Amino acid sequence: MLIPSKLSRPVRLDHTVVRERLLAKLSGANNFRLALVTSPAGYGKTTLVSQWAAGKNELGWYSLDEGDNQQERFASYLIAAIQQATGGHCSTSEAMAQKRQYASLTSLFAQLFIELAQWHRPLYLVIDDYHLITNPVIHDAMRFFLRHQPENFTLVVLSRNLPQLGIANLRVRDQLLEIGSQQLAFNHQEAKQFFDRRLSSPIEAAESSRMCDDVAGWATALQLIALSARQNHTSAHHSARRLAGINASHLSDYLVDEVLDNVDVSTRHFLLKSAILRSMNDALIVRVTGEENGQMRLEEIERQGLFLQRMDDTGEWFSYHPLFGSFLRQRCQWELAAELPEIHRAAAESWMEQGFPSEAIHHALAAGDAQMLRDILLNHAWGLFNHSELALLEESLKALPWESLLENPRLVLLQAWLMQSQHRYSEVNTLLARAEQEIKGVMDGTLHAEFNALRAQVAINDGNPEEAERLAKLALDELPLAWFYSRIVATSVHGEVLHCKGDLSQSLSLMQQTEQMARHHDVWHYALWSLIQQSEIQFAQGFLQAAWETQERAFQLIKEQQHLEQLPMHEFLVRIRAQLLWAWARLDEAEASARSGIAVLSTFQPQQQLQCLTLLVQCSLARGDLDNARSQLNRLENLLGNGRYHCDWISNADKVRVIYWQLTGDKKSAANWLRHTPKPAFANNHFLQGQWRNIARAQILLGEFEPAEIVLEELNENARSLRLMSDLNRNLLLLNQLYWQSGRKNDAQRVLLDALQLANRTGFISHFVIEGEAMAQQLRQLIQLNTLPEMEQHRAQRILREINQHHRHKFAHFDEGFVERLLNHPDVPELIRTSPLTQREWQVLGLIYSGYSNEQIAGELAVAATTIKTHIRNLYQKLGVAHRQDAVQHAQQLLKMMGYGV
């Protein structure tokens, strides 16, 4: 629950001075991105801005306290304030904030701005006491907020110091409205108005001006002068002389002498006890101070001018002026030290009764009452955990003695889940093992099963599938059906383990069960995870259309539960969509998906972007754009050297490196990589198959055909046994290259036919295209034989078109520079030298060599088909050939002579 008073603008009191000159300046705030009001305590920042805010309906107010340094708490209140200002316009952002289901503050703010793009009227958000924020993550997020907020949005920040919000940049760009302490200081006219409203006897203007000068226009000092004069029946001038030169850091003695010592004992105790509350209402006051009518007492203190201010229009919530509240809390520690723990306990009880467990924990910690803290956690800790109050929970659990945790082992489980959420895997197992060893008596079987479910999740995250499977099975055997969360975790882990082991059908079944349970119990992140896993399994099985449809369901889930869009898991989904699009040669869409994945991870460590970057390299390679691929590989290799990655990630990164070396003939890099790359022990899943395939590709590049063939034959055996049909399709293509390069043309044709047939199921295109000219030559031969079944014939033509489109190095060889070098080559055929082709005829020869039909050549060169026939007839005559295949062979011989590996 959110405390209402933190979202209420302060009530404007009748006796306050209206700061007309400053309000005039603030009236233009809508022309600036940021209005910044800064000064030390007591200069009237909050009062001024509350005057300006009066009458503005589309304005949110957020009063900070020290607890708002928790990112999740900050986000919840900030979004709630904007919801108040917009009348609930940003419902998606509100749901994400309430459920704590966003990747970072910046991603939450990005969603907020999407919703605010449809809000066209001026909008304001006031954040009071920003100096209390010390969390650098919040500072970074607010800098992002200021950079990207809509043009009709103005942020108003009140702070005792200059906040870390990129102020200089805003100032240079004239996007900053500033009001500082010199402007906030009362002038003579305002001081006179102030005293006229506060003192029963008017004072002369000259006297008022002298007092204003004595305290340099400091509003708090003026208030103290008036209070002292009323309480002691002394002249205001005498009080002013005492305050001259005093600042906020030297007020304590003065406040004791002039305020505390001048109220009765009952009021003094009320002030000291109530000061422990960051905000207060009738029920809290009754419990903390023992007063029977808390509301009446608060209103009386307000009337006495004792620095108490209303926090909302209802008048139910109050707080002390920050300067006075800080002073009172310090005095309370000195004067009521013995009573202080009991006062905090009373506050905690009252907060609990009103449904604010996080505030209750704050007071239980301050009371040092481990038993009370334990009881609050037992009743509310899991709710706080599900709302990501992780920092508060960690602080609370650290405050409990180990014996208390052992007596309440579900708190041990909570502490372990906290560690798991922070990727402290080894600590999780150490903690649980210690607890099991030291818990007295027989441990509850259900709790033990929950321990095992968590251990299973840790094991799979840490790359230990065997242990994960054992623990997940134990958990599922012992967990009651009602313990749905742990059952979802254990089922998901078991399914993931079976995926790793290559048992795809059973893994798919378990992931479907996980999805059903997760949807039923609204555990949406596990529902999304299970859909992603299902899609990966279907891809591995070769059912790419089914994988596509599962991905569509996952995208629909994200659309329905929009908070999921902010999770890193969203990147996983768009990444596997990019992989599928790449396989189908939809390269522009694949690249866009990969880049959207990088955008999802923009606030995370760069290492997290490795997989999407790998896909960008793949797209460049499939297009034959080796320069761009090299540039992207430089970044990829830098990331590889600065992180620890799952073997799947390494396999994918190595794949594009080895393909690049193949396309550029870089045998040195391939040999070096092969020497230092460990060979996996198995090949029973897609990422282990992938790394073995990388090894075989490097061996083929180095001419090590025999060991490469052994590897590929074993991979095929495993792939057929485990029904890893997509891997089988890839393996056949690489085996085709091995046979082709080793001169075994019949074997090459046989496995290519198998690969084409299997591609009817997988839909693979780019996997053929990436093999370049060797694949193009074979496909041209198969097409000319005219023996392929209709579907394979159609696919072969499509693949050849893609190769011709993206791998233009064949055509580029017949440009003017190439022709000039060719004609000057000592081995050029005499017929070419004595009867040279025109530049257009060279272009036509290049396109014939690339497999273009006459119609395609005409379209490529934008001329009539009859013109192309004339060019072909002329070049045939000059080359001394009669048939198209003879021209292709002649072009191939010329390319070989010039040193091109065709």
UniProtKB/Swiss-Prot annotation:
SMART domains per UniProt: HTH_LUXR (SM00421)
Stretches assigned to the HTH luxR-type domain: 830-895
InterPro entries in UniProt: P-loop_NTPase (IPR027417), Sig_transdc_resp-reg_C-effctor (IPR016032), TPR-like_helical_dom_sf (IPR011990), TPR_MalT (IPR041617), Tscrpt_reg_HTH_MalT (IPR023768), Tscrpt_reg_LuxR_C (IPR000792), WH-like_DNA-bd_sf (IPR036388)
Residues holding ATP: S39, P40, A41, G42, Y43, G44, K45, T46
UniProt keyword annotation of RNA-binding present: no
Quaternary structure and partners: Monomer in solution. Oligomerizes to an active state in the presence of the positive effectors ATP and maltotriose.
Protein name: HTH-type transcriptional regulator MalT
Organism of provenance: Salmonella dublin (strain CT_02021853)
